[in-house]
Amino acid sequence: AATLRDYQTKQEHDIEMMRKQWEHGDPNHRVTLDETEIAKVVSNMTGIPVQQMAESENIRLRNMGKVLKEKVIAQDAAIDKVVKSIQRNRMGLKDPNHPIGVFMFLGPTGVGKTYLAKKLAEEMFGSADALFRIDMSEYAEGFNTSRLIGSPPGYVGYDEGGQLTEKVRRKPYSIVLLDEIEKANTQVFNLLLQVMDEGRLTDGNGRLIDFRNTIIIMTSNAGTRQLKEFGRGVGFNAGGIGSNGMPIDEKDKEYARSVIQKHLSKQFAPEFLNRLDEIITFDQLDLPAITSIVDLELKSLVKRIENLGYHFQMTDKAKEFVASKGYDVQFGARPLKRAIQNYVEDGLCELLMEGNLKPGSVISIGKNPKKDELTFKNMIKD
């Protein structure tokens, strides 16, 4: 007790000395706190993105569709549906005892379902960290369902909290991404019904978790296998629609959507589908869309090259070549990253290892007209 008393006395004396030093210090060197700094502190303490309010809410909502379309290529219809649903909620036209939005993203792999969720998190809440991704294939068995809300008292993991409820409790302003929802057990859907309908869920500790400030997005590949089997599926058969890289017309897109929607009604219960705000079908990507995505994928590479002290430029023919090599009608944009690695990054790596580049050099990438490859030239910046 005496030791603690002495420690307390010393701490109080130190605080008093620092206070006097601060009061008699140089006023010209005092730290000034403005509303932006206070907003950041409040945001860190509460998990609420207060700094987003610096921009007018109406202006941000009005420009959201335009911003997302610049980042997510060839999915304008899907973006419009998501943005309009969010705008209705934020303007107070929807039930307040309901999540901001509950969406189901449908479509084949590599068309931007998860990517749109990430960009939506950045635009809505200011950071990609606001996205919680849960792989629903881990909840295919019924006994795993309790992991979402936390184990009941007396069971292993009772003190850890649920993988869904605990994250939302700590960060209520977020996007919950339930990936491949069709693989989840039926008990998971029973849990989600309450969240989708009332915006709340009770965890294993008996606490009521508020989902009213979250966006819930479920992704599914339902119906894409049926598109392959029908032989007329968009880009799924060898000689089918879109397999030659030509733009896919609206009639074929509507046919693909109808096939997916028909299979969706067979796979999910009506009471589950009725609680969704929007069921959004993503269109298959064609070659012009992949060519546009090349520019987005190269931005991060350009930054890495500039961090090394060099500059980087690429001709349109070289971009078209990479797009054609990275275009697979069945897998969307995923093969594009491998094509950039194999044809662009490997060539840059060889050029860097030669040791002939000087600080400020410009690396020019073009298409070899005689061979099926790219050319890399070392140019000095003027």
Whereabouts are the PLM-identified features?
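AAA+ P-loop NTPase nucleotide-binding core of proteostasis motors
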Residues: 2-382
